[in-house]
Amino acid sequence: MDRVLSLGKLPISFLKTLYLFSKSDIPAATLPSMAVALVLAAPCSFHLIIKGFLWNQLHLLTFQVKNQIDGIDEDSIAKPHRPLPSGRITPGQATLLYRVLFFLMWVAAVYTNTISCTLVYSIAIVVYNEGGLAAIPVVKNLIGAIGLGCYCWGTTIIFDGGKELHGLKAVAVLMIVGIFATTGHAQDFRDRTADATRGRKTIPLLLSQPVARWSLATITAAWTIGLIALWKPPAIVTLAYVAASLRCLDGFLSSYDEKDDYVSYCWYGFWLLGSNILPIFPRLRGELP
């Protein structure tokens, strides 16, 4: 009986392991990309939403598993709850999992007609994880932005019944890429100790803390103003969006502690989520096809 119960727990344990691989990217990758897809696509069925979510998570997990295989030492300091440093899975098992996920990712691409998106994404994650470009701060942000853009691109296509992006929909996804390319280093403030241990050269380590934080604040404020002007949300939504931006920036500017930076990064995720759902207002006004 105990053996049967133990076997019954394996699927739950495996799902928890997958969740722990992607947990830290839920605020800044999963939620924003799902939100923007729901906003940009025409109203869709629950079946398409589940299909898009699984495609989204399959692509995210493929990147995260390989990235965490290469970053065990770093994660043992900054994120000990992750599957590899906590011992839930061995490096060998994780490598096998990565290969299976990569294969399934391409099966999903063929099945959902998102081959172009998955091709761009595959090139991006390979050059990021295996090409050594993650060590170059500006390139790291750009590739991260391309990855986020691909999550939005592919998920939107699935939600929209296979239609390719065009017009304001394409503009919205390009805005997401631009936002993350210029502000994505917000995630690196919380990992300074681990990044320094691993020898990574992130923007928060290359620049002084005041310069790194105030430049992030300036860019984020500029995007906030620009997106409000572009998408023209109602006044109450504008106030809420600005409030999220100010809370995020106040956190980064008022404390340099990495624990506080983790909280500020969560607020950054909410601000990014807000940035991604603002195109709903052109849709409500009938400006999106």
UniProtKB/Swiss-Prot annotation:
Pathway: Secondary metabolite biosynthesis; terpenoid biosynthesis. It is a multi-pass membrane protein. InterPro entries: Prenyltransferase_related, UbiA_prenyltransferase, UbiA_sf. Fumagillin and its derivatives have been intensely studied for their potential use in the treatment of amebiasis, microsporidiosis and rheumatoid arthritis. They have also interesting antiangiogenic properties by the irreversible inhibition of human type 2 methionine aminopeptidase (METAP2). PANTHER family: CHLOROPHYLL SYNTHASE (PTHR42723), CHLOROPHYLL SYNTHASE, CHLOROPLASTIC (PTHR42723:SF1). Pfam families: UbiA. GO terms for molecular function: lyase activity; transferase activity, transferring alkyl or aryl (other than methyl) groups. Its EC number is 4.2.3.211. Belongs to the paxB family. Beta-trans-bergamotene synthase; part of the gene cluster that mediates the biosynthesis of fumagillin, a meroterpenoid that has numerous biological activities including irreversible inhibition of human type 2 methionine aminopeptidase (METAP2). Within the pathway, the membrane-bound fumagillin beta-trans-bergamotene synthase af520 converts farnesyl pyrophosphate (FPP) to beta-trans-bergamotene. The pathway begins with the conversion of FPP to beta-trans-bergamotene by af520. GO terms for cellular component: membrane. This is Fumagillin beta-trans-bergamotene synthase af520. Keywords: Lyase, Membrane, Transmembrane, Transmembrane helix. One of its GO terms (biological process) is terpenoid biosynthetic process. It is found in: Membrane. It catalyses: (2E,6E)-farnesyl diphosphate = (+)-exo-beta-bergamotene + diphosphate. The chain crosses the membrane at residues 35-55, 95-115, 142-162, 165-185, 222-242, 262-282.
